[in-house]
Amino acid sequence: EKNMRILLIVTLMLSFTAYAQEESSREFADGVIELTTVKVKTNFLQDYLDGIEKTWVAAAKIQKEMGIISDYNVYIGNDGSTVYLTTAYPSWANKAPWSEEQTAEFQEKFRKTISQEDNVELSQSYEDIREIVSVELIGRLVFK
């Protein structure tokens, strides 16, 4: 009986030691990235990029200054008609709805870059030249 106890204790100790030494070779990085895939009609890429520079990029710059996002990027696919928009949030909490103060601050700053009428007009013109294919939240893996 005593030998069985010793054997059981040794077995448990070895299994805990082996389990404690196991370490994952990868982990998720902090934050989350919103990836939007946009298909732009042929010959309208420049028009689309000109438009988002005044709207989406301007808004992203303000959000970055406010600390809501940590980065943003625009990528063009090799087909010349697919655009990838990325918005990096430093944490999932930053993806949450904005407070009234944040909304007011953003609107005040954004109105200095483009009028409400111009923003609506540009945004509506996108409907004719692009299709949003997908919006995904993706995480970045870090390999150790």
Task: Give residue ranges: language-model regions.
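Positively charged n-region of N-terminal signal peptides that target proteins for export
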Residues: E1-L7, Q21
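Short amphipathic alpha-helical segments
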Residues: F44-I69
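Solvent-exposed, acidic/flexible segments
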Residues: A29, K41, L45-L49, E53, ...
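Solvent-exposed loop/turn segments at secondary-structure junctions
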Residues: N43, I76-T82, P90-N94, E105
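An amphipathic, aromatic/His-enriched active-site/gating alpha helix that lines ligand/cofactor pockets
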Residues: I62-S70, A88-E136
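Sec-dependent N-terminal signal peptides
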Residues: I6-S15
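Short, glycine- and small/hydrophobic-rich beta-strand elements in well-ordered beta-sheets
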Residues: E22-S24, A60-Y84, P97
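Immediate post-signal-peptide N-terminus of mature secreted/exported proteins
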Residues: Q21-L45
